[in-house]
Swiss-Prot record:
<protein>
    <recommendedName>
        <fullName>Large ribosomal subunit protein uL15</fullName>
    </recommendedName>
</protein>
<keyword id="KW-0687">Ribonucleoprotein</keyword>
<dbReference type="InterPro" id="IPR005749">
    <property type="entry name" value="Ribosomal_uL15_bac-type"/>
</dbReference>
<keyword id="KW-0699">rRNA-binding</keyword>
<dbReference type="GO" id="GO:0022625">
    <property type="term" value="C:cytosolic large ribosomal subunit"/>
</dbReference>
<dbReference type="InterPro" id="IPR021131">
    <property type="entry name" value="Ribosomal_uL15/eL18"/>
</dbReference>
<dbReference type="InterPro" id="IPR030878">
    <property type="entry name" value="Ribosomal_uL15"/>
</dbReference>
<keyword id="KW-0689">Ribosomal protein</keyword>
<comment type="subunit">
    <text>Part of the 50S ribosomal subunit.</text>
</comment>
<comment type="similarity">
    <text>Belongs to the universal ribosomal protein uL15 family.</text>
</comment>
<dbReference type="GO" id="GO:0003735">
    <property type="term" value="F:structural constituent of ribosome"/>
</dbReference>
<comment type="function">
    <text>Binds to the 23S rRNA.</text>
</comment>
<feature type="region of interest" description="Disordered">
    <location>
        <begin position="1"/>
        <end position="52"/>
    </location>
</feature>
<dbReference type="InterPro" id="IPR001196">
    <property type="entry name" value="Ribosomal_uL15_CS"/>
</dbReference>
<dbReference type="GO" id="GO:0019843">
    <property type="term" value="F:rRNA binding"/>
</dbReference>
<dbReference type="Pfam" id="PF00828">
    <property type="entry name" value="Ribosomal_L27A"/>
</dbReference>
<dbReference type="GO" id="GO:0006412">
    <property type="term" value="P:translation"/>
</dbReference>
């Protein structure tokens, strides 16, 4: 077997549709587009969600919910993210330096998710009751 002797399996490749090549090809004249109408024209077609003039579904349904602006500058981090910080002191700046949070985050809350093995000192971050218990059980502490 050589590279120049390789070929696809029989029937694995279909030949391309050759449109507008005579009546007997089956794809001559209208080229598989049918007669007249918007979809037969060059550049013809309708946008996504268009229902022929009927009020489309996305406009029939009501709007709901909103995006809280708080979500743009408040982050929740897991216990196992605390281990990614160099040293044993975890602050907002040290989390940014370790790429755990983005630079536009202004406040952080540590939640009880994942595990923590090393003892860390958490400074100036929000901590849930469960996360506080887990940090203290690992030998760490929380400072406001």
């Amino acid at each position: 077997m050589r590279l120049n002797s390789l070929s696809p399996a029989e029937g694995a490749k279909h030949s391309a549709k050759r449109l507008g090549r005579g009546i007997s090809s089956g794809l001559g004249k209208t080229g598989g587009r049918g007669h007249k109408g918007q979809k037969s024209r060059t550049g013809g077609g309708v946008r996504r969600g268009f229902e022929g003039g009927q009020m489309p579904l996305y406009r029939r349904l009501p709007k709901f919910g909103f995006t809280s602006l708080k979500s743009f500058h408040v982050a929740e981090i897991r216990l196992n993210d605390l281990a990614k910080v160099d040293g044993n002191e975890v602050t907002l700046e040290s989390l940014k330096a370790a790429n755990v949070i983005t630079k536009d985050i202004l406040s952080v809350k540590v939640i009880l998710a994942g595990k923590i093995e090393k003892a860390v000192v958490v400074k100036g971050l929000g901590v849930t009751k469960g996360a506080k218990a887990a940090i203290e059980a690992a030998g760490g502490s929380i400072e406001e």
